[in-house]
């Protein structure tokens, strides 16, 4: 039982560890405007793209995909920034 708990805890820690930063982490260009690099969970098709994290540390977590998002016009109560995003390669 203790071995199983230790193995699960180790697997969770490895899965949550950050990966290499995407090229040009921080600022990017969307349709001629300066945008921000965000990390979205690609494992959940729709909800994962709506719940994107603005890249502050320079790395995305394992299982996340880097997107360049235009955040210039998002001033409402609900910011749907995934609609203004372009996937980075």
UniProtKB/Swiss-Prot annotation:
Signal sequence, start to end: 1-16
Disruption phenotype annotation: Does not affect radial growth and multiple stress responses.
Induction conditions: Under normal conditions on SDAY medium (Sabouraud dextrose agar plus 1% yeast extract), hyd1C is consistently down-regulated. Hyd1A is the most active at transcription level under normal culture conditions, followed by hyd1B, hyd1E, hyd2A and hyd2C in order.
Subcellular location, principal: secreted
Disulfide bonds: 28-68, 39-60, 40-52, 69-85
Domain of life per record: Eukaryota
Compartment(s) of residence: Secreted; Secreted, Cell wall; Vacuole; Cytoplasmic vesicle
Glycosylated position list: 36
Protein keywords: Cell wall, Cytoplasmic vesicle, Disulfide bond, Glycoprotein, Secreted, Signal, Vacuole
Family note: Belongs to the fungal hydrophobin family.
Function noted in UniProt: Aerial growth, conidiation, and dispersal of filamentous fungi in the environment rely upon a capability of their secreting small amphipathic proteins called hydrophobins (HPBs) with low sequence identity. Class I can self-assemble into an outermost layer of rodlet bundles on aerial cell surfaces, conferring cellular hydrophobicity that supports fungal growth, development and dispersal; whereas Class II form highly ordered films at water-air interfaces through intermolecular interactions but contribute nothing to the rodlet structure.
Annotated protein name in UniProt: Class I hydrophobin C
